[in-house]
Every structure is written in C-alpha cells, then in structure tokens.
C-alpha cells in the first residue's frame, strides 16, 4: 500500500525537475495505463517522458494511428511488469487491517495488524493481467533494465467470454442486467479509456437526457455501456482500464473482449495497437471478409 505521501504523489500531473524524480514510485499497485495522458501532454511545449508497461504501449500505438498523440513530442521508457496487484482480491483473501504489502517473486507478503500472510501472486493480480499479452513493448525509445521482452503471452484470454456465450439468452441478459444495474454513471470507464478520446462525447449533450448522471430506466443503464463498446470496437486494445477503475466492480472489459473475439473470428486475428499503420478490420475491406448473412445466422 502507498503511504500518505505516496498517495499525494499519485495525483500530481507530472514530474518537472530531476530532483522530483527521487520521489517517483513504481510498484505492484501502479496499474494505470498512462498512454491516454499523452493526448494532452504531447500538445504542450517541449517533450514529455512517459513510463509505459508492455500492455500500455498497444494503447499508445493506437493513439498514434488515430493521430491523437504527437510521437515526436513523446519519449517512452518501457518498464517491466509481472502483473499488477488487485487490492480488492487481497482483501477478499482474508487480509484485514493491512499495514504493508511486499512482493517476493511469485509470492505476495501481506502484513496486517493481526499478523502476516502470504498469497500467490497469480491469485491476486488484476483480472486483465490473467490475459497478459506478454512482455514485449511495441513502442519505446528506451527500455528499463527490468524488462523481460521474451515473457510469453498467457492463454485463456476468452475463457470468461465463452462462459457467457454458453449461457441461454435469458440467463446472459439477466447477468448483464444485474451487473449494469450497479452503474452510477460516474464516467470513470469512459474517462480512463484510451479509445474514448473524442473531444466532445456523444453522451455530453445537454439537448438530450444522455448527459445526466442518474439512469432513470434499465434501458439507460445498458445503453451507455453498449454504445461505448460499439464505439471502441476494433480499436480497443483490451487494456482493462475500464474494469480496473470502476467503483462498482462491473466487469466492463468482458463487453469489449466479446467484440474482440467476434472480430477475430469474422475477419481473422487482429490486435489493436500492435502497429501504427495497419487498418482495423471494421475500417478495411477484403474479399475474404465474412458475409453479413453469416453474422446474422451466428447471432
């Protein structure tokens, strides 16, 4: 856990002097994808240095592809990652009154006011890290010493999606209705998402009720997230930030991952952000593209 001083440091926009970098902290709880911050930073005077994990660089590449970030005004230092920790999972493992959390390889040591406890790292990492793309940075200017570029991608990326697909339509609808009913329209998922980079969001329109925070019907609960998922389809890199920041713990990444799975099956395997020049399946056409009738039959 971060000290009060460290928590204060987390909310600062940037480090502007070499001296201030002595307060820089990078540990198992630094899970934020900083690529979206470069939209604003790269428009300012001078060059900005940013530390990106392997998965973050996919989002950065996608922003480059969409002309949202000025690459010449950005200096990327690639940093290693063994999977970021989920404090909620640590608490659910029975750890209360936590005073410190330390990492020791594949073991997480948790000190509490009631005693110490050891947990397996794999059991308490963020859900997105269970589908890690591997240790390779697809964009960087310099790599830190702790990078393992040969770290392989994990398997089972679509296991949870397949479980949802196996449900009866009524059961699947009930699942999402229950999950989305907890939404408080805080917009955290939208604000953190690198693919949601519109200058003015369609939901921020005072002429319509979509700008209001509170949902008045179950349809509105579903509409916001379904439309957002459609808007980022083919551009979502599966960074998982939407689920990480959700205060209601809604597994929003599963909606986006379902789109990714379908796109892979319809148009061939595609990873958004893997490069900066290829065209996404939904903005490109080949004679091998799936026919609309097949999509309709598949459902």
Predicted stretch roles:
Residues 15-45:
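Active-site-flanking structural segment that lines cofactor/substrate pockets
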Residues 59-66:
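Short active-site loop/helix that positions an aromatic residue
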Residues 70-216:
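Catalytic cores of enzyme domains
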Residues 46-50, 74:
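Generic beta-sheet signal
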Residues 153-181, 195-299:
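Ferredoxin-type iron-sulfur electron-transfer modules in oxidoreductases and energy-metabolism complexes
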Residues 6-7, 186-189, 239-242:
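Twin-arginine (Tat) signal peptide motif
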Residues 51-59:
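Gly/Ser/Thr-rich loops at beta-strand to alpha-helix junctions
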Residues 1-11:
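Single conserved hydrophobic/aromatic residue that forms the stacking wall/gate
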């Amino acid at each position: 856990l971060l000290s009060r001083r460290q928590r204060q440091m987390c909310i600062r926009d940037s480090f502007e002097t070499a001296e201030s970098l002595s307060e820089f902290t990078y540990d198992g709880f630094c899970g934020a994808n900083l690529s979206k911050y470069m939209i604003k930073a790269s428009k300012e005077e001078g060059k900005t240095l940013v530390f990106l994990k392997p998965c973050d660089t996919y989002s950065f590449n996608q922003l480059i592809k969409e002309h949202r970030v000025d690459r010449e005004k950005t200096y990327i230092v690639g940093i290693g990652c063994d999977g970021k920790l989920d404090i909620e999972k640590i608490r659910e493992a029975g750890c209360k009154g936590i005073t410190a959390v330390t990492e020791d390889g594949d073991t997480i040591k948790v000190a509490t006011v009631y005693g110490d406890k050891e947990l397996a790292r794999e059991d308490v990492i963020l859900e997105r890290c269970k589908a890690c793309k591997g240790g390779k940075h697809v964009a960087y200017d310099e790599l830190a010493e702790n990078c393992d570029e040969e770290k392989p991608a994990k398997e089972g990326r679509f296991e949870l999606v397949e479980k949802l697909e196996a449900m009866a339509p009524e059961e699947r609808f009930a699942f999402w209705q229950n999950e989305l009913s907890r939404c408080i329209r805080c917009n955290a998922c939208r604000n953190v998402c690198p693919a949601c980079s519109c200058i003015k969001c369609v939901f921020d329109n005072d002429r319509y009720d979509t700008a209001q925070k509170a949902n008045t019907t179950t349809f509105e609960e579903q509409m916001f997230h379904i439309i957002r998922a459609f808007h980022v389809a083919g551009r979502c890199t599966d960074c998982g930030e939407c689920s990480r920041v959700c205060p209601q713990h809604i597994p929003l990444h599963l909606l986006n991952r379902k789109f990714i799975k379908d796109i892979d099956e319809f148009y061939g395997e595609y990873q958004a952000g893997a490069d900066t020049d290829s065209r996404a399946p939904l903005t490109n056409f080949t004679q091998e593209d799936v026919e609309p009738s097949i999509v309709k039959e598949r459902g």
